[in-house]
Curated annotation (Swiss-Prot):
PANTHER family per UniProt: METHYLTRANSFERASE, RIBOSOMAL RNA LARGE SUBUNIT METHYLTRANSFERASE H
EC number: 2.1.1.177
Class in the EC hierarchy, top level: transferase
Pfam families from the UniProt entry: SPOUT_MTase (PF02590)
Keyword flag Cytoplasm: yes
Designated name of the protein: Ribosomal RNA large subunit methyltransferase H
Alphabetized InterPro entries for the sequence: Alpha/beta_knot_MTases (IPR029028), RlmH-like (IPR003742), tRNA_m1G_MTases_N (IPR029026)
Single GO term (MF): rRNA (pseudouridine-N3-)-methyltransferase activity
Subunit composition and interactions: Homodimer.
Keywords: Cytoplasm, Methyltransferase, rRNA processing, S-adenosyl-L-methionine, Transferase
Role noted for this protein: Specifically methylates the pseudouridine at position 1915 (m3Psi1915) in 23S rRNA.
């Protein structure tokens, strides 16, 4: 299985890079992982709604340029489905069974995802109604993907 994470924003913090490296190493037993890091657009402090929309659309075009036709796209979105780790594991497993072996997770920038990216998504997923820094969220996502594979294989980790 191929897992791709497309994320807007550069990872700067060393501790987050170390966590990403650790989960990337752990996931290498289960899948081929690719992380695509895209630059985020600078948002002015007092940006208007129109300016924010333009920024999301610009980031969205960049995201869409990285998505291939054969990718099963999961958009990380506050309006998405909230599911348990077990159901997440089953979802990933079912993707493989249905022939969707190229799963792509999309993490937007600080303003979220454009409507075009949301429309392209095959599934919308929400980890929480709380807001997280998108750099930290990348670590959280990889941990949940790792947990999902461990659950799938009935290996100890998840409690």
């Amino acid at each position: 299985m191929n897992i791709t994470v497309i994320s807007v924003g550069k990872l700067k913090e060393k501790y987050l890079k170390q966590a990403i490296d650790e989960y990337s190493k752990r996931l290498s037993r289960y899948c081929k992982l690719e992380i695509i890091e895209l630059p985020d657009e600078k948002t002015p402090d007092n940006a208007s709604e129109k300016e924010e929309l333009q920024i999301k659309e610009k980031e969205g075009k960049l995201i869409l340029s990285k998505i291939k036709d054969n990718m099963h796209v999961i958009a990380m979105d506050l309006k998405g489905n909230e599911i348990t780790s077990e159901k997440f594991s089953k979802y990933i497993e079912n993707c493989g069974v249905m022939g969707n072996s190229n799963i792509t997770f999309v993490i937007g920038g600080s303003l979220g995802l454009s409507q075009e990216v949301i429309k392209r998504a095959d599934y919308k997923l929400c980890f929480s109604k709380m807001t997280f820094p998108h750099q930290l969220f990348r670590v959280m996502l990889l941990e949940q993907v790792y947990r999902a594979f461990r659950i799938m294989k009935n290996e100890p980790y998840h409690k």
